[in-house]
Amino acid sequence: MQPALKQGYAVPCFNVFGYEDALAVVKAAEARNASVILAVNLDMTLFMPLEHIIGMLKPLAQSATVPVCLHLDHNYDIPTVIKAIDAGFTSVMYDGSQLPIAENIAGVKQVVEHANNML
């Protein structure tokens, strides 16, 4: 994603709900020789174990001929967010917006500390 930042262009992000969606997005990105972000939303994590999701999407991303970012989108469950970091998601979004501000900040801090320990 660094080339996009340096060269000032956007990278599209698509919510995917299964392998077929993800494959179609990656194939379209490859046809355009464009980077892409595959976003996994909360609904997908409620119906499929995170380990299965990463097992399905990570090989697809790694075998793509263009850069593919795996993003866990708007997830409010800290253990799930941490599990996603450990499993190899490129980015995560912890969403504590429904919590009191102090709890939200504490949750963000916990996720950031864990992510920084992975560097």
Q: PLM ranges: what are they?
A:
Residues 1-12:
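N-terminal amphipathic alpha-helix/helix-capping segment at the start of soluble metabolic enzymes
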Residues 32-34, 86-92:
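Glycine-enriched alpha-helix->loop->beta-strand junction motifs that scaffold or abut catalytic
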Residues 11-15, 36-40, 68-74, 92-94:
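Hydrophobic faces of well-ordered beta-strands that scaffold small-molecule active sites
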Residues 7-8, 32, 118:
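Structured helix-beta-strand junction loops
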Residues 20-23, 46-54, 74-83, 97-119:
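Active-site-adjacent beta->alpha loops and helix N-cap segments on the catalytic face
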Residues 19-64:
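Glycine-rich, positively charged N-terminal anion/phosphate-binding segment
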Residues 64-71, 118-119:
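Short beta-strand/loop segments at the ligand-binding rim of alpha/beta enzyme cores
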